[in-house]
Amino acid sequence: MAEICASAAPISTKNTSVEELRRSVTYHPSVWRDHFLSYTNDVTEITAAEKEELEKQKEKVKNLLDQTPNDSTLKIELIDAIQRLGFGYHFEEVIDESLGEVYDRYEMPSGKDDEDEIRVRSLRFRLLRQQGYRVPCDVFEKLLDDKGNFKDSLITDVEGLLSLYEASNYGINGEEIMDKALKFSSSHLEGSIHKMPTSLSRRVKEALDMPISKTLTRLGARKFISLYQEDESHNELLLKFAKLDFNIVQKMHQRELHHITRWWEGLEFGKKLPFARDRVVECFFWILGVYFEPKYEIARRFLTKVISMTSILDDIYDVYGSLDELRRLTHAIQRWDISVGDELPPYMRICYEALLGVYSEMEDEMAKKGQSYRLLYARQEMIKLVMAYMVEAEWCFSKYFPTMEEYMKQALVSGAYMMLSTTSLVGMEDLNITKHDFDWITSEPPMLRAASVICRLMDDMVGHGIEQKIISVDCYMRENGCSKEEACREFWNRVKKAWKCMNEECLEPRAASMAILARVLNLARVINLLYVGEDAYGSSSTKTKNFIKSVLVDPIHSIEYHI
């Protein structure tokens, strides 16, 4: 989220109005405006023929899964293709059962199978870790020479190196061999990419830019479908089903975004709050990264509205509000009473009433299911968030320079991922999510703190030098007497450790179900996509626009070219 602060001007003077003292920043207008209002029911209708064809092809894929032996290389290759093509959610139980058998046989002698092949060894390891199995990394020791380095003979096996690279991104803290594997595979892939055939070099480049472990399912599927189609050994059944499923789900998402856009247009924030980012489509894309599956439609609607309101609040606290106004807004949100809105200036009242309206909508729907308690947690996390915003605003206006420890204590909250992670569970009605799960996620467990570290540090690294607010880069440089480059190098190391922490938290025994952990993991993946090298949320007219087009505008045709 953007962080813009006042310059050295005092907070107020006798002869200067609040309007003259307001901070300001210029954001580009919405890229999409009312584009998605055109996706009406007749446009996004899924025909009976499409539904029938989907079920027909789905049954064929299931038969293929059932008929392929679990102890074969073909089975793990099939599972990998299904997951990367984006329709693994249809076959979660079958895949889980199959990989369970693979895990049971993991350390058994392989006979004449190609167990020692680097590609297969790495693929099996990755799939099992993705599934949460705590498989040991010593399986890669056989690939080392007498000096403890990876054998030179592996360098020419590009497919093997690529598989090793993907597997090494599932390492956890303390696994030195996985660090070696990542360095070895990535360096040799980068060094030889210009010598590879075009189709292979594209696969390698995509992987180096965004490994599977950090890839958003829908965006990754769109890209992989194109790559998979170019592979001469591709399975035509899988390719056909992937395209059909992608297009059908895209229609569902377009219909959802139509209703979200209509809600947003009704609020008229673009006119009434012109200082704020108008990014509701980008917010929907963000939440699509958290959960894309059709069954999470209600959860997606809830969380999209909450993150959209959070973006507006963020701009009020960081860009526009005076200190007195911000104190009043914070007090009002702590009170959580619609009548308190009368005490706010008009522009804040608009936002405050819309915020309470979103939570009232959620509460009404969850009350019908006897799950109103979930809103107590969600509201409290929003209150905690704005209190952190307020602390940072006080620092900004008083020109207080916090220590790195002081800053991170607030910044891990103000990054909003603690609030969003908790709120992501509210609408997940199909799962047996309990009060215990909400108690766990609001206790700031390691998984959530790691995601918050990734969110905060990646945001701050791209924001330094642009934002006028003191952020982590400034704090670290001041405390350690170092350059921005040295600070960012340290932060990247912290981000890498946080990813490894998240990898480990997803392994059995887990503190929560994978369905819950996946929301936190996916939130980190979105940040990793949008905040590498730039703030592609605040400036969403290029890279982010293309991402959105690929998953929410352009259907997949019979001939699909690279995105």
Curated annotation (Swiss-Prot):
Its EC number is 4.2.3.75. One of its GO terms (biological process) is diterpenoid biosynthetic process. PANTHER family: (-)-GERMACRENE D SYNTHASE (PTHR31225:SF221), OS04G0344100 PROTEIN-RELATED (PTHR31225). This is (-)-germacrene D synthase. The Asp-Asp-Xaa-Xaa-Asp/Glu (DDXXD/E) motif is important for the catalytic activity, presumably through binding to Mg(2+). A motif (DDXXD motif) lies at residues 314-318. Mn(2+) 2 binds at D314, D318. Mn(2+) 3 binds at D459, E467. InterPro entries: Isoprenoid_synthase_dom_sf, Terpene_cyclase-like_1_C, Terpene_cyclase_plant_C1, Terpene_synth_N, Terpene_synth_N_sf, Terpene_synthase-like, Terpene_synthase_metal-bd, Terpenoid_cyclase/PrenylTrfase. The gene is TPS3. Residues 320-326, 392-429 are annotated as: Homodimerization. GO terms for molecular function: magnesium ion binding; protein homodimerization activity; terpene synthase activity. Pfam families: Terpene_synth, Terpene_synth_C. Residues 44-71 form a coiled coil. Keywords: Coiled coil, Lyase, Magnesium, Manganese, Metal-binding. Binds 3 Mg(2+) or Mn(2+) ions per subunit. Its cofactor is Mn(2+); Mg(2+). Homodimer. It catalyses: (2E,6E)-farnesyl diphosphate = (-)-germacrene D + diphosphate.
